[in-house]
A protein has these predicted regions:
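Short, glycine/charged-enriched secondary-structure capping and boundary segments
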Residues: 22-25, 66-69, 90-91, 115-119
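N-terminal glycine-rich phosphate-binding loop and ensuing alpha1 helix
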Residues: 3-60
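Conserved beta-strand scaffold positions in the cores of enzyme catalytic domains, especially
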Residues: 26, 75, 128-129
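Conserved beta-loop-beta/alpha segment of the NTase-like Rossmann-fold superfamily
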Residues: 81-132
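Short loop/turn elements that form and flank the Walker-type P-loop nucleotide-binding site
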Residues: 2-3, 97
Length: 132
């Protein structure tokens, strides 16, 4: 049975303005990386979901390990700009052919479960949605 809902987690940024050797999504907070916090949040709130991560070459091995640990789709490399990373994520899930796709910037982890549920409800009504 194919999954109708796929989440693309954009975790490919290098955080130029952040000025740190570690990518923002790999910063640890309360024993979990920002990426892990996103994975845990979405798996908890959306039970039937496949998650596709898009990352950069420097974090690829770490993200691959996280994907194995959390039973996610294999990560893909992103582009040098966000829209290219979205494109590569969409290419990666094209073989799954999901009915719904959510795209989330991993470094914006404070989205609420209520917003996610509204987005899914609206998308089922064929309303295209964006949450800032």
């Amino acid at each position: 049975m194919k999954n109708k809902l796929v989440l693309i987690l954009l975790a490919g940024g290098i955080g130029k303005r952040f000025s740190n050797k570690i990518s923002k999504q790999m910063i640890t907070y309360n024993d979990e990386t920002i990426l892990e916090k996103n994975i845990i949040f979405f798996k908890k709130n959306l039970k039937k979901i496949s998650i596709q991560t898009v990352t950069n070459k420097n974090d690829f091995l770490i993200v691959s390990e996280l994907c194995k640990n959390y039973n996610l789709l294999s990560p893909v490399l992103g582009g040098n700009e966000r829209h290219k990373s979205v494109y590569y994520g969409l290419l990666a899930i094209s073989k799954i052919n999901p009915k719904y796709v959510l795209i989330h910037d991993t470094c914006r982890p404070l989205i609420s479960s209520e917003v996610i549920k509204k987005l899914i409800t609206y998308s089922k009504q064929e309303i295209f949605c964006v949450a800032p």
